[in-house]
């Protein structure tokens, strides 16, 4: 079974049941599926395709869940990375995994900016941070789904 099909199935069959509880947020399957679809469409609009690698450098949070499910729906591959990695190791793992998109937390802005010149496979528009806007990065909350 394709894991990307599970969430839409639950959204159809149990739309009002709670899917996610994260800090003060509670989302139903319908709401969570809509958020995941929005992200999947936005990533597709940025050129992410089936089989592409999407690295995550995120804590356990709503954006991590959304990313995992969106990437699964697209048939792309999640590359989970730790925020504890030093710049050299982070660069090596991103390059060795053939990652083309990075979604990271704001505390990764400086390390990613420092290794940006080494990330040949990651176009600027696919370097995405959650939280407040940072120069040189797309803002996760401002990603636009394709129409």
Identify the residue ranges that each predicted region occupies.
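Structural core segment of the AMP-binding/adenylate-forming
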Residues: 5, 25, 45-46, 73-144
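Conserved AMP-binding/adenylate-forming core of the ANL superfamily
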Residues: 3, 8, 16-61, 65-69, ...
């Amino acid at each position: 079974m394709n894991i990307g099909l599970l969430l839409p199935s639950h959204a159809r069959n149990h739309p009002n049941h709670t899917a996610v509880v994260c800090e003060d947020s509670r989302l139903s399957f319908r709401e969570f599926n809509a958020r995941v679809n929005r992200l999947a469409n936005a990533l597709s609009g940025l050129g992410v395709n089936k089989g592409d690698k999407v690295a995550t450098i995120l804590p356990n949070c709503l954006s991590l869940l959304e990313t995992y499910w969106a990437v699964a729906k697209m048939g792309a591959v999640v590359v989970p990375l730790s925020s504890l990695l030093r710049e050299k190791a982070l660069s090596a793992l991103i390059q060795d995994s053939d990652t083309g998109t990075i979604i990271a937390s704001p505390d990764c802005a400086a390390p990613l900016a420092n290794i940006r010149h080494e990330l040949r496979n990651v176009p600027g528009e696919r370097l995405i941070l959650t939280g407040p806007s940072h120069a040189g990065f797309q803002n996760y909350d401002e990603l636009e789904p394709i129409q």
